[in-house]
Amino acid sequence: MEFVQEYSDEEAAAIEREFTRLKDKHYLDHGGATLYAESQIQAVHDLLTANMFGNPHTSHQTGQLMDEVRRRVLRFFNTDSSEYSLIFTSGATASLKMVAENFTFRAADSAEGDEGAFVYLRDNHTSVLGMRAIVGTSRIHPLERENFVRHLKVSARSSQRKPSLVVFPAQNNFNAAKYPLELIEEIRENGLVGYDDDKFYVCLDVASFVSTNFLDLDRYKPDFVCMSFYKIFGYPTGLGALLIRKGSEDLLDKKYYGGGTIQIVMSGKNLHRKHVKPSDCFEDGTQPFLSIIALLEGFNTIQRLIPPSNGYRSMERVSKHVFNLAKYCYHQLGELVHANGAKVIHFYMDSRFESRDRQGGIVTFNVLKDDGSYVGYAEFARIALKHAVYLRAGCFCNSGTCQRQLKLSDEGLLEYFKMGKICGDDNDMIDGHPTGTVRAAFGYMTKPENVDRLVEMIRERFVSQGISRPVKPTNRSSNDEELELKAIYIYPIRSCGSFTVTTSWPMVDRGLKHDREFSIVNSNGTPLSQSKHTDMASIVPKIDPRSNVLILTHPTMPDLILNLNKLPTAKSTILPEDSVDCGDEIAAWISKALRQPRLRLAKHLNDGNHSPPPKILMINGNALRSLGDEDSAEDQATASWLVEHFQGNLVVEAPATVDMQTWKQVAIGEHRFKVVGMCTRCPMIYVDPASGKVSADSLKAIANVFKKKVPLGMYLAYVGDGGATARSLQCGGRFILEQKDHSKVTSITESVVRFNFNG
């Protein structure tokens, strides 16, 4: 199908001039954040440099301009201060949290324990799910998408008296499915089936919706509206709003009070009186007044670039534009097929783009190979990035829709967690099943050429043309065909260097003993990663198991030797519950080595259940060597060097022609491992472990690996040793693998049936 153009040629050209910085970049993550226009930022600069804006508690000029912004926001949503109060927050998440913290679930005359209900749609953002942790009621219930409309009652009951709250999104941020906003008044008037005594109020998450749609609060009137401004304008970030319907503010019982929110307060006697006006009562302290003022230029930019036309408001025209783009993308992707006729794209949509009333400007999908297996979303996103196509991959902080679309139960999700899968990681495949998806989200400045580039990239990189790469002949003897564990690499400190073991290494319940047992954290308790701090590779830890000491080396530092039996293990408020601080001596050494102040070393306790065990990466050395010329000493040296780049734990010798993607479980001696995903090739592999730098040689060698598309490694989860007395993993012996067809092999030809993987 052809793209249906909403903008005139002049409007499209004017918009393109605002985003010259994009050049050949194709930005398709407007669901995460849209982009700011160049003239918008220039106008903000001019406004700030031409005026002196002081604290609004002092400056009358600043306060007046902030009030003008409030009126502008309300007018943008077709309402005014007689219908809604506006409270500035740090974003939609903070707005949702404010409602959750302060909503009163008990009527004034109700008995103790006689409380209302908190009901939420499962297809909500994580920030809504987080409300469950702090709402003032124990009656917390989820609703499935397909049951949502059915739960509406036919008529109201006179017994409705318990204040209750229902939360749902105007538009699903996962795939832009829209919910009928007519439900708002129906729920307020009629309630929900099974909640006869509950008087429901509606909290509407519009963060995704208002980014590319017009929200008409004169027509649809939820009690609470939560939003972020950067989703609409790109700038400023860190600013959102909570809009409260008049009359509903009485349901919020605010406890804390900060500067500027009280009429009187006594420092001795515990007495205070809050302001009555919601914006004065709820906006604690000094608001980000410069960011608030900057919103004016966001509104001006949208109205200037996309003026109302043919009876449609600016944001209604944006809605038409992104819907047309998404529909065009949906059909273009849907037409892709492999040479054998198999579909290339699996969609995760709740509509087929029949109506703009029910669908917004997002297309969510995964790529399929010609055999029907999936391309991992993380691998896809990285390849797309190499082609300057910027997308979002994962579950987009919407586990409810992600589970529903991937057909993953709560029990299945928990099983993935036990295998090491956590939110935000790159573990995109488990047992051949995707753990997330790819999202293309469109904004007002997106062009059809951006969609064309996405489709072209998929056609170039993922669509099979029926030409297979011949298998390279091998000169290895049959003895070399056996599967053998050659070496073990231990990484005591996450994102730092490793040491090699060629004999044996002890195993514990969580896997390899001491592997990723420590993390370097900053003053906020956030772990450092080599992907952002490449010089972490220069710190090489080694553990001597006989004396139980940790030895740290660095090119510019004297070695530091720490006795693990006497290591300080103090609890710290900045660290997770299952971690302890390792003391000042090692903290000072690490801070000096990395040239960053106030770093600490955290030790992760093995007896907690707060975090999953680290995944074990198995690398096939033969597969790496197969990438180059067998007779080239340089190529084979590069292959050995790449083993360290991939930061594998177990280096095995398996035939390069073996398809590791068919492996299901592995047994090495008495120790069993479950395959939980293929190597996702994270950015840390570009870092030279010897120098801690991203070198040209690294990029060249690894680009060659990716180009040949050879599966080089897989992630394993340690299952156990079946109660065996020997707790060490031995190098040098053969191992047994179970393939997905349930066959078990120790070499290419020899079948083995003696090992029981079920214990």
From Swiss-Prot:
Keywords: Molybdenum cofactor biosynthesis, Pyridoxal phosphate, Transferase. Pfam families: Aminotran_5, MOSC, MOSC_N. The keyword Acyltransferase does not apply. The keyword Zinc does not apply. One of its GO terms (molecular function) is molybdenum ion binding. Its EC number is 2.8.1.9. InterPro entries: Aminotrans_V_dom (IPR000192), MoCF_Sase_C (IPR005302), MoCo_sulfurase (IPR028886), MOCOS_middle (IPR005303), PyrdxlP-dep_Trfase (IPR015424), PyrdxlP-dep_Trfase_major (IPR015421), PyrdxlP-dep_Trfase_small (IPR015422). Coiled coil: none annotated. Residues 591-738 form the MOSC domain. SUPFAM superfamilies: MOSC N-terminal domain-like (SSF141673), PLP-dependent transferases (SSF53383). GO terms for biological process: Mo-molybdopterin cofactor biosynthetic process; molybdopterin cofactor metabolic process. The active site is at C397. Gene3D superfamilies: Aspartate Aminotransferase, domain 1, Type I PLP-dependent aspartate aminotransferase-like (Major domain). Its cofactor is pyridoxal 5'-phosphate. The modification N6-(pyridoxal phosphate)lysine is found at K231. Belongs to the class-V pyridoxal-phosphate-dependent aminotransferase family. MOCOS subfamily. This is Molybdenum cofactor sulfurase 1.
